[in-house]
Every structure is written in C-alpha cells, then in structure tokens.
Amino acid sequence: MKKIFRTLCAALALTVCLCLPAFAQEAIPAQPAAKEDKVVTDLTGRDAFLRDVKGFTTNFGGPYVFAQADHKSPAEPYGAAPAEGSVATLRIYTMSDDKGDASINASGHAFVSVTNVSDRDINVGGLLIAPGKAVTIGTRGNRSEHSGIWYDLESYYMYYIPDYYYHLYAMQTSLDAGQLEVLNRGLRRADHWSACYNCSAFSEAVWNSVCADALSAGRPASPANLQADMLAKYSDKTAYEPPIPYDYAVYYGCALTPSREFA
C-alpha cells in the first residue's frame, strides 16, 4: 500500500511540474536566430484581408493587466545611454500603416523590445537574454500558429522583409531590476488578443507600467492613435524607422513554444 501511495505521489508531482506555466519554471536560454538564407513573403490582398477578418472575429481577450512599478523612469531620447543602475532598455514601436494586423481599424502594428544593458543574462518573459542582446514582444490575433503573445516575430519579419514595418516610430526608457520584474509579471497574463485589446493596447500597458511619461493608444486602441500621441507629446525623443535587431528565434505563448512557421 505504501509503495502504491509513493507511486501516486510521484506521478502527481510529475504532473504538476509538467503543467506549470513557463513563468513558474526556471527561465530558459533564448536560442540564437538561425538567419537562414531564404526568401520570406507574407499574405497580401484578399488573403491578408481574410486572415485579418478571422483574427478579428475569433479572438476575444480582455484587458492587459500590468501592475504599476513603485517608481517609474522618464522617457529618454531614442538611443540615449541607459540610466545609472539600469539592467535593460525598454523601447516602444508603432506604425499606423496597414500591414496585416487585425486591430480595431486594421491599421498598423505596435510592439515593444527589451535590450539587456547589464553584464549578465536577464529574464524577459521566461527567456534568458544575453548582455547586449534584445528581444521584441508583441501580441497578434491573425497568425495560424498562435493568437496572443509573440517573442521576436517582429525581428524575424524585419530581417527577412526589411520594409515590413515602414514609417515606424520608437522611443525608450530605462528599466532597473524591480521594473523588469513588474514587466515580467504582466507578461505572464498577456497571452491573448482581441479587436479592442490588441497590439497597441498591449504596448501601452507595458510602457505605462514602468515609464513616468505615459502614452495613450486611445479608445478603441489603435497603432495610429499610439503614434499620434507619441509624436504629439514626445517628438523630440522619437526615432523614425530605427533598426530592429534579430538576435533570437521566434517563440510564442506563456509556454514559450518555438515557432515552426517562423523558424
């Protein structure tokens, strides 16, 4: 009987471990981007429209819930040196031209990136990012593999299709270890997307949780609104069409599943 009990306990413990979300487990090293010599294309015309319609009508995620850091950093000019004591730089990007993201007005895309400015690996969403390396983070509802949070998908597109995100604007702020933890806690609850709570709502929530200079994506949220607010408030801190590094493979979801489609 004791042997059976021990066996059942062991099986239960194994099941619990397997079912733990990625953020409850030890962070994993992000795998370097393959950067294969290949031609990558995306849907256009009617096919892109139908993909957006499907995303618009089949995803119903709610608001992005990010706690507010107990201290917030000011916005900085894009490319500025990180503030003293920082471990990372957070950048927010937005473009208002339609490129297939099914947001409420089907126009544009918004996302963020985190760059490691420390001398050791940092945990971003469960991925270990090496010093000097960066990862992009965004949400989408119109990709067949997954609806929700994606890591380095934007980097993948910009590497293989350099004009994929054109007329892109960006600004940045610095993160210390405590602010990075606030961001990570929010990412654990951000694996969803909907027409109202879309990529721009996600980017706004991330930014405002740690930056004292707030941005608004409007209501309903859209990349166009986010871009307009960024340029109206902080035009002296924005960069136009900044480079997007492609350091790591593409992952999606809280389970950090490596993408097959975007490998």
What residue ranges belong to the model's regions?
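Activation targets extended, charge/polar-rich intrinsically disordered C-terminal tails
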Residues: 25-28, 37-65, 181-263
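Ser/Thr- (and often Asn-) enriched beta-sheet segments in non-cytosolic proteins
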Residues: 39, 87-91, 174
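Glycine-rich catalytic cores of cysteine/serine-nucleophile enzymes that process amide/ester linkages
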Residues: 49-167
